[in-house]
Structure formats: C-alpha cells, structure tokens
Curated annotation (Swiss-Prot):
Name of the gene: kdsA
Pathway the protein contributes to: Carbohydrate biosynthesis; 3-deoxy-D-manno-octulosonate biosynthesis; 3-deoxy-D-manno-octulosonate from D-ribulose 5-phosphate: step 2/3; Bacterial outer membrane biogenesis; lipopolysaccharide biosynthesis
Example of a GO cellular component annotation carried by this entry: cytoplasm
BP-aspect Gene Ontology terms: keto-3-deoxy-D-manno-octulosonic acid biosynthetic process
Keyword annotations: Cytoplasm, Lipopolysaccharide biosynthesis, Transferase
UniProt family annotation: Belongs to the KdsA family.
InterPro entries in UniProt: Aldolase_TIM (IPR013785), DAHP1/KDSA (IPR006218), KDO8P_synthase (IPR006269)
Domain of life where this protein originates: Bacteria
Keyword Iron: no
Protein's name according to its UniProt entry: 2-dehydro-3-deoxyphosphooctonate aldolase
GO terms for MF: 3-deoxy-8-phosphooctulonate synthase activity
Catalytic activity: D-arabinose 5-phosphate + phosphoenolpyruvate + H2O = 3-deoxy-alpha-D-manno-2-octulosonate-8-phosphate + phosphate
Subcellular location: Cytoplasm
Enzyme Commission number: 2.5.1.55
Length: 284
C-alpha cells in the first residue's frame, strides 16, 4: 500500500514518516493560556525534533450542557490563532461546525477539522473540501473504520486530496469508549493510504450517564498512547493543560502540561523503533 503524503507547511504527514504531534488544549480559554500552552509544546517538540501542529477549538458547539463553556467564538479565536502563528511560527488545526465558518477559518489556520458528530453531514463536508485546505476527519464514535472511505470519497469528489483521518475511540455500550487497534490499518486501506492519526485524549472519555460533562481516565493516557504508536501512525493528537482539574473542558482526559516532555519522548522512541522495522506481509 502506498502511503500518501499530506503537506502542512513544511511538515510531511504520512504513515511511514516520523510522527507529527497535533497538540494543544481542548478549547481556547484565554489568549494568555493559549500562549503559555503553545510555548511549552514548541519548546518540547523543538528539543525532541518532533514535527508539531498546535490544536485548540474556538467554539465547542457540541457541549452536552447549555451551561458549559464553549470558547471565545470564531472572531476572537482566529485573532488568537494568528498571534500564535506570528509569535511561534506554528501550523494550526481547529474544527468548524457550520458551513459559513469554513472559508474564514481556512484563511487563517492550516488544517480544518471535521468533528466526529458531523462527519456524515455532506453539505459541511463539501464546503470544507472546497476551501482546498487540509482536512482532518474525526472518525465518529458510531462508525466503523471501513466506513471512513465514504467520507474520503466525498472530499475527493470536490477536488481535495489533502485528507488526514483520526480515530478518537468507538462506542462500547453506553457512555464508554474503546479503541480498536485493528481499525487504524483498515482506515489506511479504505482511504488508499491517507495519513491516520490517533486522538488519545478523547479516547479516554468516560461519561457519567446522568452528568453534564465528560469524565476521563488520564491516568491511562500513557499506556493507551503507547499502544497506538506501536501500530505505526502518521501522528498523535493530544491535549494538555497546566491544571487539568481546572480546565474548562475535558480536563479529566488531559495530560498535565508538566508531563509533556517525558510523554512525547516516550512516543518518539516507540515511533522511531516501530518505523525502523521491515514490514512483514502476512496476507499470504
């Protein structure tokens, strides 16, 4: 199988290239917090030689509760993103939820993300594709890995081949997620070699069936991330926070920012080792 290369600035994202870290925070909480988090990621990834893309949302439009924090909104969020780019020279990924957001967001950031809950909304998919931007497609929790090929086809029909696929866990009964490690290579195959990345943070969500916010299992983030990196992936999607217990969204799944260097160092070691192996064809 040929692995496609998707270029994000000067980064080549591909399943057989050194992994790219798509890291940041769940949602923009403030300009100062974004600067602090991005600076730490840049410092760590530069030190370790890991390609890096900053991630955060300007609007968490799918929060469970009407009272939950959503973010600063598109206009303010894009200003913060532009300042991060100007200050740190980073590439940026963020999600869109509405058709009208696609064009202005794609003019500022480098990758626009199709949220898992919206991945089958054809009009939104087409609007994103027509921007020509790189698109990161989150696999819906309710969709099999094999069905991701249909979403890639929709984007390709609009003339856009710049697609990354991302697994963020699959429903396991009510209010729980598991990660099917066999699904990563299925997504590679049905997409004809698109880069596949692993959102380890959101895969750790575990909901209170009667609560308004997601719980999480950040104490298991390292073991789950190690498992995913052993597959041989194009990238890892990670959220970290200086104080996860006070984070405005998904703190229970976020890596403490103080642990970032040790964590990324381990992921790089696994990626380097796995990609040094000769591929063994066991199909015959």
């Amino acid at each position: 199988m040929n692995n496609k290369i998707v270029k994000v600035g000067n980064i080549e994202v591909a399943n057989d290239k050194p992994f790219t870290l798509f890291g940041g925070m769940n949602v923009l909480e403030s300009r100062d917090m974004a600067m602090r988090v991005c600076e730490q990621y840049v410092e760590v990834t530069n030190k370790l030689g890991v390609p890096y893309v900053f991630k955060a949302s300007f609007d968490k439009a799918n929060r469970s509760s009407i009272h939950s924090y959503r973010g600063p909104g598109m206009e303010e969020g894009l200003k913060i993103f532009q300042e991060l780019k100007d200050t740190f020279g980073v590439n940026i990924i963020t999600d869109v939820h509405e058709i009208y957001q696609c064009k202005p967001v794609a003019e500022v950031v480098d990758i626009i993300q199709l949220p898992a809950f919206l991945a089958r909304q054809t009009d939104l998919v087409e609007a994103m594709a027509r921007t020509g931007a790189v698109i990161n497609v989150k696999k819906p929790q309710f969709l099999s890995p094999g069905q991701m090929g249909n979403i890639v086809e929709k984007i390709a029909e609009c003339g856009n081949e710049n697609v990354i696929l991302c697994d963020r866990g699959t429903n396991f009964g009510y209010d729980n997620l598991v990660v099917d490690m066999l699904g990563f290579n299925i997504m590679k195959k049905v997409s004809k070699g698109c880069p596949v990345i692993f959102d380890v943070t959101h895969s750790l969500q575990c909901r209170d069936p009667f609560g308004a916010a997601s719980g999480g299992r950040r104490d298991q983030v390292t073991e789950l991330a190690r498992s995913g990196m052993a597959i041989g992936l194009a990238g890892l999607f990670l959220e970290a926070h200086p104080d996860p217990n006070s984070a405005k969204c998904d703190g229970p799944s976020a890596l403490p920012l103080s642990k970032l260097e040790a964590f990324v160092s381990q992921m790089k070691a696994i990626d380097d080792l796995v990609k040094s192996f000769e591929e063994i064809d066991t199909s015959n």
